[in-house]
């Protein structure tokens, strides 16, 4: 019944008292039932029946009304009411109250917030929301500069980041230079080379099975672009493929350098930023540049920009431009503190960057907190996730005045206000007692934040998917297109009605298939003109969608959407029916 609370939770009616002889009704003032007239008629019939039973001596007059309708239930209902409640048909139930989609937390697995003792947070792209496309444009331009420094033609400097091109969940084929969108079973949905979307026939020439096999993924032929930090990387790689093939006269080859050579050649990230160069042993002879080599150079340049501090320095120089600041953030953390929850920060960022970003976002809002550090019970920077969740690293204490590290002997507990660097999950659990389902960890990185913490240690999790806001907006705008697609799929099913093994002439559905394709293309184009929706392609779920369903207990566009729920809330997941079950209650949705 928790969903019957409206968006302001349980504080909305504080000024309205309910007389002791009146109990609030389940539906009164909370939702309007389209079947209200039917309920009134039903109650009249029930009261008439009860009166007849009394007149016949079959029922005690002390209780004329023994069958409760939906409008009669208290909020929450009593045991007597539930025992005497008469069910409505599923089709007659009024719509379940749901929060506005843009403010909702979506549920894959049940979580009771009042059983969560520890709330943990990542920083980058979770607490620190980077303003798009400004941040991606900055990263894109800085990686371009690195590539020019190591010998790429200066003509690439004219390339610009296109926020309408990249999406997460793509597979980059190192051998052929293609970007692939695949479904949850590994089937190729879309193939893009440079900025050109390839036809199915052309795609099948490269991938005869039209699948990405697990063996090919295991041998690292495909690189999964799964984080928000990889958006500029995906765009730049595609732009370089186009530019180098069409304009610079360089010949990109499909040949892959010898694996032993690749193992023996030092990565660019091992070199100082002032002496970055291309190791010629790692490139094709006769001046050819392979797609694999191009990927390695782009990947390494991206790592350099992130690891040498240059990108972070630019962000810190103009925090309002690159990072969101909202007063809701300290409000949310104050509510966690008031609720006696333990709160920890677990980030891979170093202290100097974490301190300046968190100070910018949280300091100065609440006089009860002198520093952003006061909102947290434990602060760990330089965590080196996902390694933190396995063997970990040596834990050190950070001198918050100088930023220097010192070896510390943490025996009994982490001290509030202090900042620690590195460590491991085993040590964290030993010192805090935070284990398993009592921990809710909130992050944006499916692998480093979600999969490792969940599969290895049973932490509950909330995945932040900022793209969800755009997806929901497009879904709302394209309702008519979606309904038309559903109609076409229904028509296709009807064409085969009654056909069995005696039927020998297949129906001609070429025209219908073309309409289905055109409608599906229109819908995909509304999300992203190259790759479509992050979660769907028509009725097919994407690989990214599969990961979200499999590993994320909860997911939302912004962690601050938790402000729309009381901290005792019970998130209930939909019961997902098998195909043979779905027809029974196809219109009955009990999601949050």
From Swiss-Prot:
Binds 1 Mg(2+) ion per subunit. Transmembrane segments: none annotated. Its EC number is 3.1.3.5, 2.7.1.77. IMP binds at residues 122, 124, 299, 303, 312, 347-349, 385. Mg(2+) binds at residues 122, 124, 444. Residues 1-37, 252-273 are annotated as: Disordered. GO terms for biological process: dGMP metabolic process; GMP metabolic process; IMP metabolic process. SUPFAM superfamilies: HAD-like. Disulfide bonds: none annotated. Its cofactor is Mg(2+). Coiled coil: none annotated. The active site is at 122 (nucleophile), 124 (proton donor). It comes from the Eukaryota. CDD domains: HAD_cN-II. Keywords: ATP-binding, Cytoplasm, Hydrolase, Magnesium, Metal-binding, Nucleotide metabolism, Nucleotide-binding, Transferase. It catalyses: a ribonucleoside 5'-phosphate + H2O = a ribonucleoside + phosphate; a 2'-deoxyribonucleoside + a ribonucleoside 5'-phosphate = a ribonucleoside + a 2'-deoxyribonucleoside 5'-phosphate. Residues 1-15 have a biased composition (Low complexity). One of its GO terms (cellular component) is cytosol. Homotetramer. Broad specificity cytosolic 5'-nucleotidase that catalyzes the dephosphorylation of 6-hydroxypurine nucleoside 5'-monophosphates. In addition, possesses a phosphotransferase activity by which it can transfer a phosphate from a donor nucleoside monophosphate to an acceptor nucleoside. Through these activities regulates the purine nucleoside/nucleotide pools within the cell. Belongs to the 5'(3')-deoxyribonucleotidase family. This is Cytosolic purine 5'-nucleotidase. It comes from Dictyostelium discoideum (Social amoeba). The gene is nt5c2.
